Amino acid sequence: VGSEMCIRDSCNELSVKYGYEKLTFLEGDIADYEGVDQVDMVVTLHACDTATDYALAKAVGWHAKVILSVPCCQHEINGQIENDVLKPILKHGLLKERFSAIVTDALRAEYLEREGYEVQVLEFIDMEHTPKNILIRAIDIGKKGKNSKRIKDCEAFLNVEPTLGRLLGMQKD
């Protein structure tokens, strides 16, 4: 599910060409998508800001066996993060942006572990090609993580409430 019709059409043609009849690409907003009850694998590629969170929440809800997510811009945490101890980092826009991106993806990995996934955060392509080269790879192992307190402590320390936590019911725990 994505917003670029030309990419959707091209990807659908490739899936037919290579015999992947059950692989489909749709145009739309992932937050509103209700087309299936279960999927085997969810792949996100540069889903901007909280679109990644909506896709990850859908993947968890579908009990996807595999999640491959390449996040894009991580603006949400950048707009929320506050901490006097970290002022030397947060007072500089560029450093705050990069730190916020790392925090965002680290918390995403923690949420996925909490939901029963084994998670790796990897660099999947050389920095010379794109600075957005982080892959969050998650494999469903069916065993919920016991890291809720660690997540809550981190969020409280940074004064953040990420969308993925809300979507997965973390703020209620």
What is each of the regions a protein language model found here?
Residues 10-173:
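Class I S-adenosyl-L-methionine
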